[in-house]
């Protein structure tokens, strides 16, 4: 299981750094690249997103775009499961 703790996010750079820690082969710094990474996962992967409210506070409207992208990636890749806690 991979854990993304949104309490550590103060800006977009933090967001993409944390995703890079969760997914070592991730090299992009935008939502399109992250979407490509998540939809190309070839083994079962669980991502737990903690403290989502902190992301909303730090990222503002960008957090909405992030959540839409995460939900889309989960719908497109049956091997990806995302939990928000």
PLM-predicted stretches and their roles:
Residues 1-85:
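Positively charged, polar, low-complexity stretches
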